[in-house]
Amino acid sequence: MPLNEIIGVIGNLISKGYIQKQSVIDALMSVPRHKFIPKAMEEYAYIDSPLGIGCGQTISAIHMVGIMCEELDLDVGQNVLEVGTGSGYHAAVVSEIVGESGKVTTIERIPELFEKSKQVLSELGYENVEVVLGDGTKGYLENAPYDRIYVTASGPNVPIALFEQLNDGGIILAPVGSHFQTLMRYKKINGKIFKEKLLEVAFVPLIGENGF
């Protein structure tokens, strides 16, 4: 991994205030982003921009992964659900933060991306990440309830199933909207959901029974 490039990117994110938590900084430093993108794109791996990974999907910009990890308030030992595996990069970063005592379940609907991300995550030794082929808008009841849930595609709203599979005290982070999208944070407290608008974003559409 080109250390100088990633140090430069992370330093820029810190100076802009995108990331502050040491756990997030360490995770972004540890995950080799170039392993999660097509070889033809490797020279762009540490440019802070979304990149195409095939099948009409993208790997999120480094700053967006960092922001989402910060806003999720991740911690060691948490049980986390990701809706939309894509390349597997985001799941790897979260895996680094929750550690061996935590677990990341990530759902991908596109078979080609499912196979590729599963292979890369396995080769890199992310044993606490389980990649599932399916409709992420339904959640994944088998490993519920979750302490944290995040969605990497924008839907018309957050599927009810995700709230049902969230632990009390848990957080959901999801982009909501079609052309104009807002990253929303939801927290479940004593069975009630409290929501907060964070920032304007641009994600691929959330496809599924409870998406677009």
Curated annotation (Swiss-Prot):
It is an enzyme of class 2 (transferase). GO terms for molecular function: protein-L-isoaspartate (D-aspartate) O-methyltransferase activity. It comes from the Archaea. Its main location: cytoplasm. GO terms for biological process: methylation; protein modification process; protein repair. GO terms for cellular component: cytoplasm. Catalyzes the methyl esterification of L-isoaspartyl residues in peptides and proteins that result from spontaneous decomposition of normal L-aspartyl and L-asparaginyl residues. It plays a role in the repair and/or degradation of damaged proteins. Belongs to the methyltransferase superfamily. L-isoaspartyl/D-aspartyl protein methyltransferase family. This is Protein-L-isoaspartate O-methyltransferase. It comes from Methanococcus maripaludis (strain C5 / ATCC BAA-1333). The lineage of its organism: Archaea, Methanobacteriati, Methanobacteriota, Methanomada group, Methanococci. The gene is pcm.
